Amino acid sequence: MKKYLSIAILSVLLSLTLFGQNDKTLLVIENQNVPVSEFLDIYTKNNKNVDYSKASIDEYLDLFINYKLKLMEIQRLRLDTQKNFINEFQKYRDQLAQSYLIDKNTVDKLLNEAYTRMQNDVRVSHILVKLSPYANPKDTLKAYNKALEIRKKLLNGTDFAKLAIEMSDDNSARDQNTADGRLIPGNGGDLGYFNVFNMLYEFETAAYNLNVGEISLPVRTPVGYHIIKLTEKHPAIYRFKIAHILLMYPPNATAQDKESIKAKSDSIYKEILNGADFAELANLHSDDKGSANKGGELPWLTPFRLVPSFVQPIYNHKPGDYIPPVETFYGLHIIKLIDKQSPPEFAAVKQELLTKLYKDPRYLLAQKKIADSLKQVYKIQYDKKLLVNIAKSINKDSLLKRSFNESQIPNLDNILVKIDDNSIYIKDFANYIKKNQSLFTNTDDIQIFVNKMFDNFLNDKILEIEKENLENKNPKFAA
């Protein structure tokens, strides 16, 4: 295909001066000039929230050229109906359509919020009262009141870890044994350190709005109600690099075993302070065989998911420091801090944050806002009684056994909802329930489950219809 293409990419693409050159030719395909203005028009549609940087332009330019090549090839070979070309074209259209199906102000807000939160690492403890998103009002109130009672006990001075062990539905609060007999101490509700996108959005928001030492009111997430205590807050470590010497505890280690290992670790640490080579000592003594022959050096790490006692001293030391023995349930670690990096500037990390945002459930907020606005545009008609009848016809055991079948629901060929002139049938919704039946749990209320499934289903259908009509409704999209 390339022999039909003579590409003259102007140097203006490599700088911001591109945006003053929109009357010039960007590339030539089979003697057809493609102006800069055409590229700019499509680029800005998809990139209103992205800086006009060289990296951003280069990335989108490849996509644009591939699109023009495919389109020209289709026209040249008259393969408009050939499946593989249509699929390629549809992929491009779908990507372009996405920028019209999200609320850009919401994306901007979430992006800026994420970068602000990225500047600090927080350490939290929590006590969970488990509750399904589809619980009935009675069970919801019961769980909420239980969470309030837990908070009251904490405010009256009950030890957080003790109460977490007794009352939390998060099993990590309590001691557990590994398959090889090693005891993993419970965390007493201490979740360690985290940063933006490491936790459920509702949980993250609550944590970042607490002051150190403060205990939250009950916070609802998809897994239940949480009582959250913020125990530490530090300027964020974007990533850090260390070498360590691990002296591992044996399974079922006694107090004497631990004392012996402590004495050995103290001795090694003194050798290091007296000038001994860390890498040689790691190779000689470390029980972490994966890193011992590398001088104890580990890959780049982030604080998230690491044992808090392992991470805590990193905040208070600088590169080049040797950190005294640190205890985890594995044993004792002597740490050499090689490097520690703060979060990059916004421009450097923006694409990373956008990628994480698009994969995170909070991104649905931007889609939901568009769907809600479209509900005021489209004429939507449905009878809520149909949802009641659908819920009554579903066998609860079939949902729990993941064996629900559409045939349980009567009148599958009847219309469930009309969106303007588009008819959506009961069988379409029944199939949606079937695909999502794994979300249902034993304590769920079927009617609430059906209602929330319908809300999501309706939003999806509205966005699908809007997507199909973009050419008719938006001249710029059709261009």
Name the predicted role of every residue range.
Residues 7-17:
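Bacterial N-terminal signal peptides
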Residues 1-4:
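Positively charged n-region of N-terminal signal peptides that target proteins for export
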Residues 21-34, 40-479:
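Peptidyl-prolyl cis-trans isomerase
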